[in-house]
Amino acid sequence: HGHTDPQWYADNAPFPNASALFITPDHYVFRMLYSQGIALEDLGIPRRDGAPVERDARKIWRTFAAHYHLFRGTPTRLWLDHAFATVFGCTERLTAESADRNFDRINACLALPEFRPRALFERFNIEVIATTESPLDALDHHRRLRASGWKGRVITAYRPDPVVDPEFEGFRDHVLQLGALTREDTATWQGYLAAHRDRRAYFKAMGATSTDHGHPTARTC
């Protein structure tokens, strides 16, 4: 299980910059900063209402660097320090003062072919990595990966939260979409279960070997 986007491997395009790689897509990073009073907008996190957010990757990185001490003693800090030092060769501890130098070094690396997603996958000797997708996902990126001829094994995992958690935003519409997608009547219990069986079979056919769940507690009623 890895928090990666299958589009990374399907496109195999260079990562745009250090902020787009380490901050904006990583909820372990931006949630920590948000919990300490940093606005998500200042980290480039899109708003639901479409209002403007910070787009300057260097400014986002500077905000991150100025508050990097907040990660002290966390697993996230260990992961980041390891990546900065061993993958990108950063020799300076990340601080407000060293922010630009580290940003520029990482960006210079990301421009090289050996730092593209598939190259990093191979460099790390990853045998298999599972992404996680909604039952409503067509898995187009996984289809493209299969057709590409690349030997790296990137599989999906079935994450049904949008259609099993009534508190999930858009739950009702998602259940209706599930029915339309599978041609099952999800207004009935049997039809709802049949729709899940249909999508699970599709995910399995696309390589899935597991499910993934985001329940905040073990309570079911």
Give the label of every model feature segment.
Residues 2-221:
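Metal-cofactor-binding active-site regions of metalloenzymes
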